[in-house]
Amino acid sequence: MPIHIIDRRLNPGGKSLENRQRFLRRAKSLVQGAVKKTSQERDIKDVLEGGEVTIPLDGMHEPRFRREGGTRDMVLPGNKKFVEGDYLQRSGQGSAKDSGPGEGDSEDAFRFVLSRDEFVDLFLDDLELPDLAKRKIAQTESEGIQRAGYTTSGSPANISVSRTVKLALARRIALKRPRKDEIEELEAAIAACTDEDERVVLLAELEKLMAKTKRIPFIDPLDIRYRRFETVPKPVAQAVMFCLMDVSGSMSEHMKDLAKRFYMLLYVFLKRRYKHVEIVFIRHTDRAEEVDEQTFFYGPASGGTLVSSALQAMHDIVRERFNPSDWNIYAAQASDGDNSYSDGELTGLLLTDKILPVCQFFAYLEVGESGGSAFDLSDSSLWTLYERLRNSGAPLSMRKVSERSEIFPVFHDLFQRRETSQEKAAP
């Protein structure tokens, strides 16, 4: 017999959820492009709120069948501008509201409001952590055990006493099994009875209750329940992202704003995209400290600059909490490129000997003043050091930003989906 399931859940906001999802699937590339364009002009907080995007109306046409009388290739008579073989281009200069006759076709647009979740999903759709594969384990999942309700058979060690007693009580009530106090009252009445005829009736009633008690046991084998467990796949590949940020005195408010925006976007990306990624926030001046999210983004700090302090702090945390044989380790660093001259050698040693050998990927973001005039001069000492390491084959990517509008494209470039090492090795 067929089973019919009717979903009577209300659509959100009185809208057709099925039509909305169908539209997003069909126009995904157009909507995604509009999201990327809109996000470049937004604040991170605005990105999380969703909003209105605009896509070309021409991209909304659905395929349909129509009659066609054959293919014709001709130029109608009466024009002095075109000949056979010319391409006709859309003018695009008019508007739907004010263009008059003969002023060209308008570029109509379709405005669509995205929810918070839809906006973030589309923006992060083609981003991922590079090479997310545990290097010493080929498989990506292992078997784990978790509770999965109850069963009528199992090991005595797994008996659920509470569930068994609950089911037994429900069965006794349903079958009206005589209670102990009822039997005791009847026995007391028999002992106190002096009338022989009445005593016979009471004895017959007692015998009836005792027989029913035997037929309906206190706990029946059908009542017994065992805790049930089942094996479920558990991810083996674990990832941890270290966020390193320079908050020293050489970092202007504009630079700190750029760095914070980059890390806020990274934080949203990781929390939204992956369930099994841990994030460690480390900020540094001439000394480094691990802080929480609120302090990392909004806590005031200033001082000198020693990049090695942040790298040393990261190394210590990796050694204590994140075994490289079990964890995929990623790091993203934001700085203005300034570093103490005496700290350069130690920074290089920490990177080459301690940090990069255990990292799957290391991203360096160098922030500058608005206009990027400083980037036109010679490279910073930190940029020169990192560039040398990158050219030697280290898993390191580098970018420079000086404007808010550059944060999103740079972030997308750093974390766009790439071929994994297994895919590259495959024939």
From Swiss-Prot:
Residue ranges of the region described as Disordered: 86-107
InterPro entries per the UniProt record, alphabetical: UPF0229, vWFA_dom_sf
Domain of life assignment: Bacteria
Family under the similarity heading: Belongs to the UPF0229 family.
PANTHER family the record matches: UPF0229 PROTEIN YEAH
UniProt cross-references to NCBIfam families, sorted A to Z: PRK05325.1-2
Protein's name in the database: UPF0229 protein bll6755
Lineage of the organism: Bacteria, Pseudomonadati, Pseudomonadota, Alphaproteobacteria, Hyphomicrobiales
